[in-house]
Amino acid sequence: VPRTLPALSRAAKLSKRAARVGFDWPDSKGVIAKIREELAEVEEALDAGDQQHAQEEVGDLLFAVTNLARTLNADPEQCLRTTNAKFERRFRYVEGELSAAQRPLTEASLDEMEAHWQAAKAEEKQSTHS
């Protein structure tokens, strides 16, 4: 697997290669269990104050999530691109609402921003079901 690939694409190819020879979970539930395990290891490293170990565990978590995408026949790059676009849309909504209220983002509370975020989600959901 070429080392020049973006990390997420390379992880997908590495996991696909391993799966082809049987080094894999029987189904997506096994991968989800692995994701939970890796997330717990991130938390343990953070609780121990070990930033370097936490970063290593985040890498393991990302790799496990890439495996989940593979078991769902999803392209992890496309999944992330879609989520990036969704995040950007919603964050622009938050910015727009605060701007309309003449409220600088830097002065808005997290609760206030979260309320606008949830409104953006609700608006998206309503427009997709219309």
Language-model region placement:
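Flexible "arm" and connector segments at domain edges
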Residues: 1-58, 62-130
